[in-house]
Amino acid sequence: MSFVISRRKFVLSAPVAAIGLATSRRVSADPLGVPPGIQLYTVGADMQKDPAGTLRQLRQIGYLYVEAAGFGKLSPADFRKAIDDAGLKCPSAHLQFSSADPGPLFDQAHALGVQYAVSSVLIARPLGKGMQGFVHSLSSLTADDFKRNAALANDIARKAKAAGLQYAYHNHNFEFRDLGGGKTGYDIILAETDPELVKFEADCGWMCVAGKDPVDFFRRYPDRYRMIHVKDFVKGPATTDLMGPNRPKGTELGRGFIDYRPIFAAAGPAGVQYYFSEQEPPFTDMSALAAAKADYDYMHAIG
């Protein structure tokens, strides 16, 4: 999953191809005993054009849960109505947290009816201008920067709890850059946030392309994780490069290098409650909705 500041703006991708969506429900078991969910960033272009219709198609595919990544042209209340009308549930939303007062974002979360308020990217210091400046900001974060990010996460989480919400931190791959002595920014975030207040949404795809194993984190930090992103990438060298020339190439689940069976097996005992498929654009082999169906079928099959 990826970043609110630019990536989360429901960018336009390939036009929707006509696809046949099965309306029958499968009978086999689902991972974690919970029906599959999807991060709506995956179908961001479709949500921009026809949010209500896109949500209905996701429900027809078989998804029960969605995770919001902005509201497109709708208000949070209208967005929630579209989700309800489609027969879907939305337990989590990615919001544009910063050092500013998070109160208005909590109001959005309440209007949407979510339990989890998630930061896609959380940076305490001022960011560079434009995409190039933003990417440079991420790639140049120091250990002290990550300590400030952890302090900001604690502050947001305290305020979220007071507002009746649970804050969660979502990762990319840049947090796993070696800062010296084998320590990473993600290590700092885990160590310096309050386990009772700050929970995590593990983006397993970004962890894996950085050369890390989600299973290791689930076992070392039980009860810190509440959600996961299920995404796949074409196999390549491990990298913490998020947007540069070595950026990993996203693909449909089961077509890349990540085996999610051991990840799901470890996620349940670690306290994970929800899992959301997500795919990084561009969609070159099929439309975003067709990819959403392929991802659903993969997750459903390995349950």
List where the protein language model places each region.
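Hydrophobic faces of well-ordered beta-strands that scaffold small-molecule active sites
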Residues: 34-39, 66-68, 90-93, 117-119, ...
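Conserved, mostly hydrophobic/aromatic
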Residues: 38, 58, 66, 83, ...
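Acidic (Asp/Glu)-rich catalytic clusters
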Residues: 30-31, 55-60, 74-90, 103-114, ...
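Acidic-and-aromatic substrate-binding clefts and catalytic sites of carbohydrate-active enzymes
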Residues: 44-48, 67-78, 94-103, 127, ...
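C-terminal segment of N-terminal export signals and the immediately downstream linker at the start
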Residues: 24-48, 57
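Active-site acidic/histidine proton-transfer and metal-coordination neighborhood
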Residues: 15, 65, 95-200, 289
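Acidic/histidine-rich catalytic cores of soluble enzymes
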Residues: 162-257, 264
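N-terminal secretory signal peptides and thylakoid transit peptides that target proteins
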Residues: 1-18, 22
